[in-house]
Amino acid sequence: SGGLDKAFSRVGSQFEKEAHLKGLIIKSAIYPVILILVIIVVVAIMMIKIVPTFTSQFDEVGGKLPGITLAVMAVSDFFVHSWYFIVAIIAGIAIFIHAWKKTESGAHILGKFILKVPLVGPLSIKTASSRMTRTLSTLMGSGVQLVDALGLVTEMMGNAVVKQALKDATEEVSRGIPLSKPLADSGVFPPMVYHMIEIGEETGNMEDMLDKVAAYYDEEVESATEALLAAMEPLIIIVMAVIVVPIVLAIMMPMYSLYDSIGA
């Protein structure tokens, strides 16, 4: 009974940690997502409503328009008259990517790409390291054999590259190879993960070592999430400026020219 209570306690703690990390990532993503939606709405309003209004006024006045104005007017006209084409392209790309990432090669390429993206890649690895070590510790502490525990952990991983590394590790462990070796050979997990596991293997204290690694990477995930958010905010604002400023200039430049001609 005491062993069962301990197992349930470990599983409960596991779920709490998972929920906390998931909530942290979702909470951190809310603000950037809102900013991106605002950019999309602002640009759509400017291109569909505001620019066409000024375009009709410029046509009435006549005269030569700056190149940037002509370019923005052309894009605006395309938005207004071919919006369904844009929606179809976006929907087609989304459907293609959704289907492609479900294929083995697509999932692997996408997983590899994500791991190479600055800030996002390290966050993914730290999240996977935290999840893997904590779940392994929980399962082993509940009496599950290492090979079986690795099989369950592998299925939990979302990144195909991480999943493949754990599949390979499971095969190696089933042949009697210590877990630390295939993890080190994979090139996916940070040195601290397999070094601490190696210490656990040598001392026979694997569960405690896994718990320590999980606790360390829990904090690392929080720090990496905050760093990613801090980097995304100014980047999104810069992208917004790069998109919106040319549109504003395209509208204002002919107006200033018109005012100058009237004043003259």
Model-found features: residue ranges?
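Membrane-cytosol interface motif
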Residues: 63-73, 111-128
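Short acidic-hydrophobic sequence patches enriched in Asp/Glu that either
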Residues: 67, 71, 105, 109, ...
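Juxtamembrane helix-loop transition segments at the membrane interface in multi-pass membrane proteins
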Residues: 60-63, 96-117
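Conserved functional loop/turn residues at catalytic and ligand-binding sites
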Residues: 118, 143, 254
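Glycine- and small-hydrophobic-enriched helix-loop-helix hairpins
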Residues: 1-24, 121-231
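Alpha-helical membrane-embedding segments
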Residues: 84-105, 139-156
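Bilayer-spanning, highly hydrophobic alpha-helical transmembrane segments
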Residues: 20-99, 219-264
